[in-house]
Amino acid sequence: QDPPRRRKRDTVRHVSERVTSMLRHRATRVLKRERMADGLDPSLPPPDPRSGRERARRVLRKLKERVALKFPELTYANPDDPWLKRMIIRLVEHIAGRNFFVEPYQEWIREHIARGKRIIEPMLPLIDIKTEMTGAWPPPDLDPDQPLVIVANHPFGVLDGISALKLAEDLGRPFKVLIHKDLMKIPEIREMCLPIDFTPTREAQANNIRVRNEALALLQDGVTIVVFPAGGVATSPTMFGRAVDLPWKTFTARMILAARAQVVPIYFKGQCSRLFMIVSQFGQTLRSALLIRELRIFVGKTAKGEIGPIIPFAEIKENAGNDRKKLIDFLFARVHAMASRSLDEIKADQGRLPVWLKD
């Protein structure tokens, strides 16, 4: 053969062998990483890619990539949850349109957090949700020298939480919200949250005592505290009934009595979707997974609520004394006096809620 042609052929073969070797080496490293991620021994020989187990593993890996969170803070899946529960929640949230909120979140960070503007006010407009509240705000008879607690029902979750915080922000005073510890994922709002733990453990009790003491100190310093005594989203007692708040926790009453605080009752109108009510009859996993969907389907709509007359501490003492149960019942009645149903009907439905929701 012509020497130049032979040299060219040898060069091509050499380059081809080098490239093949590099690709094989890279594939081996990738396979080892994948096997380590799957909890397998990377020193074992590679499995047959045609095996059912390997095909299932590849499908599962693609599913994980599919539901990878672009906005990992906005999810009701918690790191401590079982793996399957986390995957179900994230998958349902992904299908329900969770990623719709990524761009508004980034704009919120860029245009409001980074520039030191008001934090809560732009949240709902950025996702095209309006609020319509009846009643005077700020309350004309608000005593600026007395501790203030805002108490509200909890029909939606995220939506009424943001709406109540926006009202607190409008007062021009520092504010905090008592919130379930598992929901403190968004770093930009952690400083305005006080985490409550509802698990029946000593650690939870110690945390709640610490939070209560912190809330009392903040109230004395003029910080407004926002609280949803139900601790969870309103649910219907049956698949096709009307939603009612979960039983209110006496934690709120204890805090108000200790701080000698005045209270503003707020009632948010409406309820979550029928699908949410149906899955709530069976367990927490799908119920949690649908909460982002409930916010997504409210886009383009108007959230409505009513602000009740302020309750001075003197009136609280007159109606409840130092009895925490009486006080929480009194506040429940004042908030739900703004509802379209009678208090007796609401209480009856509350008593028929699934047992696991009343704990």
PLM regions: where:
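Membrane-anchoring hydrophobic helices of lipid-metabolizing enzymes
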Residues: 16-18, 22-148, 161-163, 170-172, ...
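Non-catalytic C-terminal accessory region of glycerolipid acyltransferases
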Residues: 37-38, 208-359
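Catalytic core of membrane glycerolipid acyltransferases/transacylases, capturing the structured
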Residues: 99-102, 144, 148-205
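Short, flexible loop segments at the rims of nucleotide/cofactor-binding pockets, characterized by
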Residues: 109, 124-130, 154, 201-206, ...
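Residue-level signal for well-ordered alpha-helical scaffold segments within enzymatic catalytic domains
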Residues: 122, 163-166, 170, 217, ...
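Short, charged beta->alpha transition segments
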Residues: 130-139, 179-183, 212-215
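Conserved beta-strand termini and adjacent loop/short-helix elements that scaffold enzyme active sites
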Residues: 134-136, 178-180, 196-198, 308-310, ...
